Amino acid sequence: MKRIVAVTICTVFLLSGLIRIGVGGLMMGQAAGLWAIEGEATEALAETKRFVSERDVNIVGFTPITYFGFIAFMGLVISMGAVGQLRRKRWGLVLICLYIVCHAFLFVNFMTVNPKLLFLVLASVMTGVLWWAGRGDGSGAVKRQGAA
């Protein structure tokens, strides 16, 4: 049962990571003027530009391009972490934890709290479940069902 839960969680992390990579790359190109996609992409870019410019605090100094690059980086980290966790490698859980740190960093960087905080809490809980499911073998990764 632990394995089924862990595989489900890793699949969710992998899919969300791939979405972050795709959206981050798409929006970086949109922000850089490499292409112009109408509709939601235009609205999302305008909203991000407004958000970044209106922040009193932006510790790192994100621009829309670097912000979307960071989103894509987070997607790469969580995707690789999910694959590592599925392969029962300790580094998988380490990368998933790095993703959580990156996600939390965005809230600290902009000194803001918004509904996306719930995604951070959910990801943290899911990571805790992965750790729980894999403990006991020393790897931090989920054991195969029936393995000693």
Regions found by a protein language model. Give the residues of each.
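Topology signature of small-to-medium multi-pass alpha-helical membrane proteins
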Residues: 1-148
